[in-house]
Amino acid sequence: MPMKKHLNDQKMSLFLFIYIWIMYAIVYWTKNCFSGAMASIVAEGIMTKSQTGLITAVFYLVYAPLQVVGGKLADRWRPDLLILIGLIGSGIANFIIYLNQNYYLMLIVWTLNSVVQSALWPSIFKIISSELAHEHRIRGVYYITFASTFGLCFAFISAALMSKWQNNFLLSSILLFIMAIIMAIVYPIAARRMVPDETGPAKALHEDFEHPEDLDTRSFTMFKKCGLFILLPVVIARGLLGLGIKNMAPTLLMESYASVSPVVGNFLNIFIILSGIVGMYFVKRIYPKRINDEVKGLGLIFTILIPVVALTLLVGKLPLSPMVIILCLIIALTEGSGLFTQYYTVKFAKYGKNGEVAGYINMAAAFGIVIQSYGVAKIADMWGWIAALAVFLALVIISVVLIIIVIPKWKKFTREYHM
């Protein structure tokens, strides 16, 4: 296990974060190339919604369990090497799909892409929450959430602007290789300027550090006590709902409103995705000043989601504009809840568990995407959009119940472990 180090040089820390932000936005864009192109692929008759969804579903089905392994690796190995593996491997996968659009080959290549990317996010989160200058860590956790929002937007913008949807994969491949080259240059420079952490587990966001010797800091014990395993289904629901709306909104609107073409659907979806910024800003304003409990904040957002998601059952009956606003509200709330889970994860950096927790959280979110990509798409194919949206509503209600169970566990845990 490498010695824990961090940057004191604030300029270098800021420069490293800016690179990581751009790199992660591009990675998130490339992970969603199929989602961005779904409306065009379906409209051209190349694949059905469920076939396109299956490619994304298999990606996340393999990606999800490997997130736990990736989280453990991020806590033990050099994060830059794990990131390089992800960037280069993903660049190769995107280029192969640009060259050959055989359905089964795409399915295999995209599955291998999920393997090489498995440690990428935990490694990114490890750098932000443990290796940046102390002053940049909490802000870094906040601003990195915008990278995924803009990355997904770029996926739909490029899909709408490209003359052929295959070109999206070519551009993705080129950018991933460029990011890999920059990573190989920038991180070693930053690493040479890092200083060793103080004795004991790495400090996360604060200068003070308490680590009573009688506490059981084994991962499984800590995660069981804090209610992490009960919270994972909530993260699954968030991933399913949030990315489900983002990925399926163009097709949903296209099939529910005659005035919406694939191109119009993609452009409308850009506004829906960008609304997530409002939700993240809202959470930043209330945390930690008004709500300093991450799980309670999560509960508040999911409670608000219940009536908002219920309104989606009126799709096709309500005019287009109100429905787009409703979808925007859902994305704002799900992105806000995602920021609460990021703050929740950072708490564990105090005990050197932040990479592992990030892996579990990302694993759960990935399972949600699996269910959305194939399961919900299949429900929409067989029984229509109302049935698929009813599934979203049921999951939100179940999530509220689970959060209520976790709240007292988390409160007790944070007191016991001085978080």
Segments and roles (model prediction):
Residues 348-383:
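A late C-terminal transmembrane helix in Major Facilitator Superfamily
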Residues 65-101:
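Conserved MFS/SLC helix-loop-helix module at the cytosolic interface between two early adjacent transmembrane helices
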